[in-house]
A protein has these predicted regions:
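Extended alpha-helical targeting/anchoring segments
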Residues: 1-501
């Protein structure tokens, strides 16, 4: 088993700074979910890839008990610590505040460790765009922060190939006895989360019998879908689509992506919902983020931005068909999607938007399309997917990269700013986290963020999610309503399943 020895720590610590110390443990009798179950009630995160489309992800990242929480609300940014409580920071937007926090630390990255070695893990809600673009004024969701991040100096890293877990603790090398203190914290974390005799709390909430989630997905009773109630009827959504099409004909936009909200009451716990969703809808970005009274449970297929070294990337997804009930039906739908002129035109537009987003922060001439318009199959739908990459400019960092791409054009339309202005007029309720970003800024400089789609938000017993459809000039209004339902089916199924766990 690997560990950072005292001698190796001494070499890394010669110049001072924050040094990650680690020890590897056998984890063949544990899973990230079983360990997460022992953190129930605590602020916590679990980030992993469980998608069969990319052979799954090697690493799962888990953390609890952050040393601070940074969040933005009502035009101010706050930092809260267990010792000091909350204080207002001078920065006016959350990305500037996070950059300042990171600059206070001189981090000695370990090239032998996975990219997340401590940092900020959380989300930017769609409404955070107000801090970046004054022209856009989305109505915020009541009580929902514009952004919330857990600041952590300890991470559990599951290596899903080796069936081991690294416990990583970041320590100020200038503290007396720093190495011993780091090892003490590592042993304490291992004892807390990996002792087989520790009781595990039940996954199901104490509320008892299942609430309203007993209808099969797509059931017609009461206009619900698997217990979720949509906020718009097909006719109401179609009316919004017609308004968007009129704006497009008038030259206001090329595409607009109106969404709708689905809500239900549930007896399932956040952990049960997470377990169900990762089985029902395994995705490249499965995440669990509990910050305060609110938990995000997501299975997003779409990368917003990623930075590894100086290479940055984005992964536009646009164009959708149902998965198909049989292999023959799936193959026919795949051919239909690949040959659909409307879907391909929409995809080209959004790939160009992704290239422009990267072009604002990349070295001139380095942005390229690595893979274009391949069909990828997910659990309930298939999409057209492309990969765009570039080399980050020397004077830019991960905070600049996220700012340049936020929010994703695939969730707003194009041009972005005008599309967002129109969405503020047409959508029936605030977007909240939908269309925002969830992921991490590592102390190493690496970042990895998914677009917040296929994501449920649990607060108390209230469970909600949103889905949208990309509207262009020749969109069929009722078909687009069906697309919002198709994109939500994994959540409908997972919520029903979770109430049996």
């Amino acid at each position: 088993m690997k560990e950072l020895t005292r001698e190796a720590f001494g070499r890394r610590a010669r110049g001072g700074g924050i040094v990650p110390v680690y020890r590897e443990f056998l984890a063949d009798m544990e899973t990230p979910v079983s360990v997460l179950s022992r953190a129930e009630g605590e602020d916590a995160f679990l980030l992993e890839s469980v998608a069969s489309t990319d052979n799954g992800g090697r690493y799962s990242f888990l953390g609890v008990n952050p040393y601070a929480t940074l969040y933005a609300q009502d035009g101010r940014v706050f930092l809260r610590t267990p010792a000091e409580g909350g204080r207002v920071l001078p920065e006016k937007d959350v990305l500037a505040a996070l950059r300042s926090v990171f600059r206070e630390k001189r981090f000695v990255a370990d090239p032998d460790l996975p990219p997340l070695q401590g940092g900020a893990i959380g989300y930017l809600a769609y409404d955070a765009v107000r801090a970046f673009e004054p022209r856009v004024k989305p109505v915020p969701e009541e009580g929902m922060p514009d952004a919330a991040f857990l600041l952590t100096d300890s991470v559990l890293v599951f290596d899903n190939r080796r069936r081991t877990a690294l416990v990583v603790v970041c320590i100020n090398a200038e503290l007396p006895g720093a190495y011993d203190e780091a090892m003490r914290r590592i042993d304490a974390l291992h004892a807390k989360f990996f002792r087989s005799d520790r009781p595990r709390p039940p996954a199901r909430a104490a509320a008892g019998a299942a609430a309203s989630g007993n209808a099969a997905p797509g059931a017609s009773g009461g206009g619900t879908f698997g217990g979720f109630t949509p906020e718009m009827t097909p006719a109401e959504y179609a009316a919004v689509v017609e308004k968007c099409k009129e704006d497009i004909r008038n030259g206001e936009c090329i595409q607009i992506v109106p969404s709708q909200k689905f809500t239900m009451e549930t007896s399932a716990s956040a952990l049960a919902l997470s377990r169900a969703l990762r089985v029902v809808n395994p995705s490249p970005y499965n995440f669990f983020l509990k910050i305060g009274a609110r938990t995000l449970i997501g299975s997003s297929p779409e990368e917003l931005v990623k930075l590894s070294g100086r290479t940055c990337s984005t992964c536009p997804i646009a164009g959708t068909r149902p998965r198909g009930a049989t292999p023959e039906a799936a193959a026919a739908l795949e051919r239909e999607l690949a040959g659909d002129e409307k879907e391909n035109a929409e995809h080209v537009m959004l790939v160009d938007l992704g290239r422009n987003d990267l072009g604002r922060v990349c070295e001139t001439g380095t942005v390229k399309v690595d893979s274009f318009a391949r069909v990828e199959r997910f659990s309930h739908v298939m999409h057209l997917v492309s990969d765009v990459s570039g080399t980050l400019a020397a004077d830019k960092d991960g905070f600049d990269l996220l700012r340049s791409a936020f929010p994703a054009g695939t969730l707003t339309g194009a041009p972005k700013i005008r599309a967002m202005e129109l969405l503020a007029k047409y959508e029936k309720s605030p977007r909240g986290v939908y269309g925002g970003a969830a992921g991490y800024f590592s102390f190493t400089g690496a970042i990895d963020f998914a677009i917040v789609i296929r994501t449920m938000v649990l607060e108390g017993r209230r469970l909600s999610m949103r889905a949208g459809a990309g509207i262009v000039a020749d969109s069929d209004p009722f078909r687009e309503y069906g697309e919002t339902v198709n994109k939500s089916k994994a959540a409908f199924e997972a919520a029903k399943f979770a109430e049996t766990l």
